[in-house]
């Protein structure tokens, strides 16, 4: 009798829960051995990885995948190199598990503090990019978590080949294969099952398009670490160094159009707009960026009229909305109303203005005189990241190793009894 998708996912979940107890108590040295051995296995399996990826690319072309999707799907030699380097970098990171802080004596004589521990089992749902399999597996492993990885059906052969390398690495370190499990079925019902197993899965991390993340957020029966959009702003204030502001705004938009930290709306103070916008617009046009602007912007430069929808849109493309604002108050109001609480920046040399912006903009990252594209775990010194969270509970901003752990209280006594002196 063929195993149903629900039975299959339940089997994975049960195995992951058992494996989480093993990896949760594994030493840092053992976890690092698994990471280094996986890196070596990837290096030895380059031909197998390339062959599996060629199957996915051929199927993708036959199924009419867009060129951008095919590009993300490709496992080039450079990307294989990147996966190997990434594993070694995670191995070199400090292990957060077991760290104890804030120990203090209470009047009763007991000591109270906090210990950092793994979350348990992390389910990760992602699309297209097979290198995410390694990113996610390495972070979960190092942070002492078991993980169930459900990649996109378009990358199934690549993910299976990568999973074989991970299994070799785990075996060499004496860890069970169920520490990292890749979902083998392409049936979409697997996603529904994975997000509905609170008895086996402690948290879900969706990485992909807005539709996927909305579905997971709506239907999940376990906590979700996620962000929906990256509608990021740069506000150029009246107190900005304009040449510096132009460089920051240009980098924020053009570093990479498709990342969630790319600037989508440029806010410019009305007092400097006439001096700033013409040359700024010329730089964007030379780069091929389509500009859309409010009425006041259009009085200064020739741009497409911006609609209400533009302020709500994450373009992930060479398109930029521009709005002239009356000052700091309107800039903050615009960001908090239209933004996605991801990453927003101010360019200003006025310290009290900067402090207000940092305090009042309700985003997971706030930049001062720096572009929003710095919103990245590596740039923040976290090493790799599992994703970026715009929620306020548990992790917020780029989620690295520490974000895949939590704290529990530890209480140490010497026979003290409550209510007795």
Curated annotation (Swiss-Prot):
<comment type="similarity">
    <text>Belongs to the gamma-glutamyl phosphate reductase family.</text>
</comment>
<keyword id="KW-0521">NADP</keyword>
<protein>
    <recommendedName>
        <fullName>Gamma-glutamyl phosphate reductase</fullName>
        <ecNumber>1.2.1.41</ecNumber>
    </recommendedName>
</protein>
<dbReference type="GO" id="GO:0004350">
    <property type="term" value="F:glutamate-5-semialdehyde dehydrogenase activity"/>
</dbReference>
<dbReference type="InterPro" id="IPR020593">
    <property type="entry name" value="G-glutamylP_reductase_CS"/>
</dbReference>
<dbReference type="InterPro" id="IPR016163">
    <property type="entry name" value="Ald_DH_C"/>
</dbReference>
<dbReference type="GO" id="GO:0050661">
    <property type="term" value="F:NADP binding"/>
</dbReference>
<dbReference type="InterPro" id="IPR016161">
    <property type="entry name" value="Ald_DH/histidinol_DH"/>
</dbReference>
<keyword id="KW-0028">Amino-acid biosynthesis</keyword>
<dbReference type="InterPro" id="IPR015590">
    <property type="entry name" value="Aldehyde_DH_dom"/>
</dbReference>
<keyword id="KW-0560">Oxidoreductase</keyword>
<dbReference type="InterPro" id="IPR016162">
    <property type="entry name" value="Ald_DH_N"/>
</dbReference>
<dbReference type="GO" id="GO:0055129">
    <property type="term" value="P:L-proline biosynthetic process"/>
</dbReference>
<dbReference type="InterPro" id="IPR012134">
    <property type="entry name" value="Glu-5-SA_DH"/>
</dbReference>
<comment type="function">
    <text>Catalyzes the NADPH-dependent reduction of L-glutamate 5-phosphate into L-glutamate 5-semialdehyde and phosphate. The product spontaneously undergoes cyclization to form 1-pyrroline-5-carboxylate.</text>
</comment>
<dbReference type="Pfam" id="PF00171">
    <property type="entry name" value="Aldedh"/>
</dbReference>
<dbReference type="GO" id="GO:0005737">
    <property type="term" value="C:cytoplasm"/>
</dbReference>
<comment type="pathway">
    <text>Amino-acid biosynthesis; L-proline biosynthesis; L-glutamate 5-semialdehyde from L-glutamate: step 2/2.</text>
</comment>
<keyword id="KW-0641">Proline biosynthesis</keyword>
<keyword id="KW-0963">Cytoplasm</keyword>
<dbReference type="InterPro" id="IPR000965">
    <property type="entry name" value="GPR_dom"/>
</dbReference>
